[in-house]
């Protein structure tokens, strides 16, 4: 039999670590744990990292969603598992435990006078020690807002509604279906329930942002540029999918607040970056320039010029670009993982390679689970499961190429919804490394890998849907013509396969619609914010922290 040549090495594919992480996320959402008032999330959901600000299970939901969006762009012809996981993440984000802080932290923190000195130094304005709530305490019910039972409808709680929309938008990006356009219920205070749709949520969020030019707040009284930049990503992807224009609030907000939220010297060099802003007391809580790295990660698809400025300044301060300077572990890995993701995104090969080598040595990458099918980063914590939030961020550097994160939001692939797609894979027994339609050759390229060796060589089947012309279909397996398939409808076929590693080429006749999302237009510089532009009145109160333990910042003197 003549073997036909096939070169798929240049096509995008998922590496082993990514597939191992994907199987673990699939495992996490496949178990129906109880996130209601009467239950508790299973302990593999991370509600431990970075107290008092991020030690809530919903941040595991949001951080776990990012790499799935990237995976959907690597294998756009196979998305069923990403959709399943993102649906599970979205559903959990509507529950009591997702909104735990807003539903239980009522009024001022009764322990505000007992904070450890470390928290005081890190989080509290100097003139309000003992009289001010730490970040992480939402203070639902305080004036001027009063008790607001709805975690979405509230004036505050930006970090809840902003990340919820981002996860839901990523879910829709994998399915092409307006799932969250139908009414869903979100848990409220005292077991109340509130009906929302994603479209109403976005309208509410963008309206709040328009009315408050400094930005909606997270905890009552505290506005976080970090969280607002994540919320902006959700609006950006939502607009691209639904052809809306809600994201315009983000560049306007950056331009309006830049000279209040960031400190520049007379030469325009960055001196400090914001952690949070309290408009009631006009107080900026800030850190050194390297803190800007955490904002840059979320900002770069939205304002790449200023985001890269923040990134380059942080890298310079940290010495990561100096091959003669040793990279040292920060107090926790979140900052390092974000740095690695940013370095890859900006194509900073020197920093990427240095941080990647550092992660391999210090993040404790490990395979686990039955047949070692799962992968995660364990961070030498000696815990039962990989630390969810940190591991999810560390995985960002494993998926896609340089620029993939920005491309997901600025140039989303919407033509995939009308292209031939692979479905019915027995995941996780069979893993999909590659599923990509090449419009030039009009061929769907698939690469499968058997994960469950106990099923090896036993029969299975897969389905190819949305084929434009069944009469033109030809199938090759590992380079040879293959006839173990049949039509199952006007635009679909069923292929008999086995539990074994294989490459499939399916000629479908699909040449591509050659249409991308609304954001495929070139982002002009006059649509982006400039560095150090404009003058805004400085805050009445400013505290620049100097610490080695900030969960979103870096080390002393940076």
At which residue positions do the language-model features occur?
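Extended ligand-binding groove/face enriched in aromatic
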Residues: 76-222, 229, 268-271
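Hydrophobic core segments within long, regular secondary-structure runs in both alpha-
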Residues: 11, 15-26, 65, 79-97, ...
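Extended ligand-binding clefts on enzyme/binding-domain cores
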Residues: 189-200, 211-334
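Boundary/linker segments of alpha-helical solenoid repeat arrays
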Residues: 92-103, 261-268, 322-323, 364-372
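Predominantly extracellular/luminal regions of secreted and cell-surface proteins
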Residues: 524-547
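Short beta-strands within extracellular/lumenal beta-sheet-rich domains
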Residues: 443-445, 542, 556-558
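Terminal, non-catalytic domain-edge segments
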Residues: 1-45, 49, 56-58, 65, ...
């Amino acid at each position: 039999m003549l073997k036909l040549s096939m070169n798929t090495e240049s096509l995008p594919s998922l590496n082993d670590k990514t597939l191992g992480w994907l199987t673990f996320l699939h495992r996490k959402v496949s178990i129906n744990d109880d996130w209601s008032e009467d239950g508790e999330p299973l302990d593999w959901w991370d509600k431990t990292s970075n107290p008092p600000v991020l030690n809530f299970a919903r941040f595991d939901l949001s951080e776990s969603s990012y790499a799935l969006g990237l995976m959907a762009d690597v294998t756009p012809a196979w998305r069923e598992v990403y959709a399943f996981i993102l649906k599970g993440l979205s559903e959990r984000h509507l529950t009591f435990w997702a909104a735990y802080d807003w539903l239980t932290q009522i009024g001022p923190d009764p322990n505000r006078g007992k904070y450890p000195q470390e928290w005081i130094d890190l989080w509290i304005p100097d003139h309000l020690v003992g009289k001010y709530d730490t970040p992480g305490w939402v203070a639902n019910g305080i004036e001027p807002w009063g008790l607001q039972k709805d975690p979405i409808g509230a004036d505050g709680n930006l970090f809840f509604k902003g990340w919820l929309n981002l996860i839901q938008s990523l879910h829709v990006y994998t399915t092409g279906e307006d799932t969250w356009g139908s009414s869903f219920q979100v848990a409220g205070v005292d077991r109340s329930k509130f009906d929302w749709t994603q479209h109403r949520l976005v309208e509410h969020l963008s309206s709040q942002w328009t009315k408050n030019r400094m930005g909606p707040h997270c905890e009552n009284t505290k506005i976080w540029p970090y969280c607002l930049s994540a919320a902006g990503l959700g609006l950006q992807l939502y607009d691209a999918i639904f052809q809306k224009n809600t994201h315009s609030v983000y560049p306007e907000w950056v331009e309006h607040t830049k000279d209040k939220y960031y400190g520049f010297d007379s030469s325009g060099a960055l001196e400090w970056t914001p952690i949070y802003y309290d408009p009631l007391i006009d107080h900026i809580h800030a850190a050194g320039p390297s803190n800007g790295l955490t904002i840059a990660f979320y900002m770069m698809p939205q304002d790449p010029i200023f985001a890269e400025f923040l990134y380059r300044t942080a890298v310079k301060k940290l010495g990561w670009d100096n091959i003669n300077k040793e990279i040292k572990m920060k107090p926790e890995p979140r900052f390092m993982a974000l740095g690695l993701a940013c370095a890859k995104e900006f194509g900073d090969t020197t920093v990427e390679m240095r941080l990647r080598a550092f992660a391999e040595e210090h993040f404790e990458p490990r395979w686990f689970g039955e047949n070692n099918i799962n992968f995660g980063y364990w961070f030498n914590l000696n815990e039962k499961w990989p630390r969810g939030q940190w591991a999810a961020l560390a995985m960002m550097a494993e998926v896609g190429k340089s620029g993939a994160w920005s491309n997901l939001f600025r140039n989303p692939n919407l033509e995939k919804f009308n292209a031939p797609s692979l479905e019915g894979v027995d995941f996780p027994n069979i893993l999909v490394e590659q599923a990509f339609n090449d419009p030039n050759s009009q061929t769907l390229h698939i690469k499968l890998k058997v994960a469950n060796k106990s099923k090896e060589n036993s029969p299975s089947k897969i389905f190819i849907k949305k084929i434009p012309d069944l009469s033109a279909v030809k199938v090759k397996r590992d380079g040879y013509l293959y006839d173990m398939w049949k039509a199952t409808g006007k635009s679909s076929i069923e292929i008999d396969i086995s539990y074994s590693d294989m490459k499939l080429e399916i000629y479908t006749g699909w040449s591509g619609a050659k249409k991308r999302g609304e954001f495929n237009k070139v982002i002009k510089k006059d649509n982006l914010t400039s560095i150090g532009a404009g003058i805004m009145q400085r805050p009445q109160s400013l505290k620049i922290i100097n610490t080695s333990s900030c969960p979103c910042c870096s080390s002393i003197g940076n």
